Amino acid sequence: MILKRYRALLILGIVFAILIVLMVFFQKIKRDELNNQLKKVELKNVRIGVGTSNGTLGTAIFGEINNKGENIISIAEMNVEFLNEYGEVKKVHKFFPVNKFSFRESLPLKPRQSKEFGFPIDDIVPEDWDGTFTANLTELIFK
């Protein structure tokens, strides 16, 4: 009697549980795929220096991104963590060394292609930044 009464609700709950399991499964597959692709893209010679970036003289983060994969990259996201003297992360900022929406350089990064980048950071760095940082690629979007 109870089974007949709540049959539709039970079926709906089972379908909902299956959808959640499938969603988690596909997210893991997508995350693993992204991690494999991130291994094929290299940040090289990332450094802080004084120079001209976007036509402005000042302190900037410079480097090179190298696509060792088979796919054309239209957007690459890089997280830079600015550390204090105790090694604590004081600020995280996103930069886009490859960005198809950029007015300045909207070209994609083709396989076996490298590109130099530079971004001004004078207005970004925290006051207690000691000059150390880490930079990692966190996201890739392919053409």
Region roles according to the model:
Residues M1-A60, K115, F133, K143:
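Membrane engagement elements in two modes
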Residues I48, S53, E70, L83-G87, ...:
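Generic "edge-of-domain/loop-turn" microfeature
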Residues G55-L57, I72, P111, W129:
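Solvent-exposed loop and beta-edge segments used for protein-protein assembly and interaction
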Residues T59-G63, A76-M78, F117, F133-T138:
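Hydrophobic residues positioned within well-ordered beta-strands of beta-sheet architectures
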Residues F62, R104-E105, E116-I121:
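Exposed aromatic-hydrophobic patches
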Residues I65-G69:
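Asparagine-centered strand-capping/turn motif at beta-strand->loop junctions
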Residues N71-P111:
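The feature marks short-to-medium sequence segments in extracytoplasmic or secretory-pathway proteins
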Residues P111-K143:
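Terminal connector regions
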